[in-house]
Regions:
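His/Asp/Glu-rich mid-to-C-terminal helical/loop segments that flank catalytic regions of hydrolases
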Residues: 239-278
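Short acidic/polar active-site loop segments enriched in Thr and Asp
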Residues: 107-108, 208, 227
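Zn-dependent metallopeptidase/amidohydrolase metal-coordination segment
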Residues: 212-250
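Non-catalytic positions within long, well-ordered alpha-helices that form the structural scaffold/packing
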Residues: 101-105, 203, 222
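Polyanion-binding loop/helix "lid" in catalytic or ligand-binding cores
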Residues: 150-161, 187, 199, 255-267
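Active-site/ligand-binding-proximal alpha/beta "capping" segment
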Residues: 166, 171-208, 266, 273-277
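Metabolite-binding pocket within alpha/beta catalytic cores that recognizes anionic/polar moieties
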Residues: 1-157
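Histidine/lysine/aspartate-rich catalytic loop segments that bind and position anionic ligands
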Residues: 134, 138, 144-191
Length: 278
């Protein structure tokens, strides 16, 4: 058996032994959204430490547990703490949570993150709906022997981010009078922030925002046939655009400041997704 799949099955067995809940939407919380759990009607929680072989987040502001519950009447599983490739994990571990949430029953993966704005016109505190992505600078989560039980060897990636879900976000933003931009997200490895020339390269490639997560999770989800949705909170202007040195504290501060609007947008979007599924 594929070692990555064997590890995934052990994690699933740990989950089933402790939790009796089937989510429809999987939500990964980025920086600044960690307390979104307060907006969920919580049924149960499961610490990452209590799942055999599960990778544990080490980043400040990422608590490290699954939350199971309801947003309105929509059953969700929420990752309160994300695992990042730069923490030293293999890429198969980086996407293990995504794969596990699919096995739990989730049909939609809702990705959120804090990202650096690259293109002119981006401002700290903006929201960006991810329409496409660039993941060429980090290892593919599908590298190695294909896990046939999850998906095909050569999956199509021409439309990773579901168009219907994008429309739902835009309608929710309009109803809440929240301005949302659209663009392409690029994932770099981190943990260091980008240099000015790296940012210039990303801009030349057509990226609008840059971060250290999300794209590989989206690939893994698409490989399994999940519908994928992504929103970035532009927490800072990338290196070379602003003269202010970058820091994680700045990222967290901006994300925290816009968290109420971000949480409202996430809630309205999930409610609309639930209505569409019914």
């Amino acid at each position: 058996m594929n070692p990555a799949y064997e590890k995934l099955l052990k994690c699933y067995d740990s989950y089933k032994a402790k939790i009796d809940f089937t989510p429809k939407v999987a939500l990964i919380l980025g920086s600044g959204l960690g307390d979104y759990a307060d907006d969920i009607r919580v049924v149960d929680t499961l610490d990452y430490h209590d799942i055999e072989g599960f990778p544990v987040s080490t980043v400040p502001g990422h608590k490290g547990r699954f939350i199971f519950g309801y947003v309105d009447d929509v059953p969700v599983v929420c990752m309160q703490g994300r695992v990042h490739y730069y923490e030293g994990y293999e890429m198969s571990d980086d996407v293990l949570p995504t794969r596990l949430m699919k096995m739990m029953g989730a049909e939609v993966l809702f990705l959120t993150n804090a990202a650096g704005g690259i293109q002119l016109g981006m401002h700290a505190g903006d929201f960006m709906l991810i329409k496409d992505q660039i993941a060429s600078f980090v290892p593919s989560p599908l590298r190695g022997a294909n896990i046939e039980e999850l998906g095909v060897r050569f999956p199509d990636m021409s439309q990773i981010y579901d168009l219907d879900l994008q429309d739902i976000v835009k309608r929710a933003a309009s109803a809440l009078e929240i301005r949302i931009k659209e663009g392409t997200y690029i994932q770099l490895s981190g943990p260091q922030f980008e240099t000015p020339h790296e940012v210039a390269m990303c801009r030349t490639l057509g990226a609008d925002a840059v971060g250290m997560s999300t794209a590989c999770e989206a690939i893994a989800a698409k490989h399994m046939g999940m519908k994928v949705l992504g929103i970035s909170c532009i927490s800072n202007l990338a290196s070379g655009i602003s003269s202010i040195p970058l820091s994680h504290a700045e990222v967290q501060e901006t994300a925290d400041a816009v968290a109420p609007k971000f949480k409202a947008l996430v809630t309205e979007t999930i409610k609309a997704i639930g209505a569409q599924q019914n």
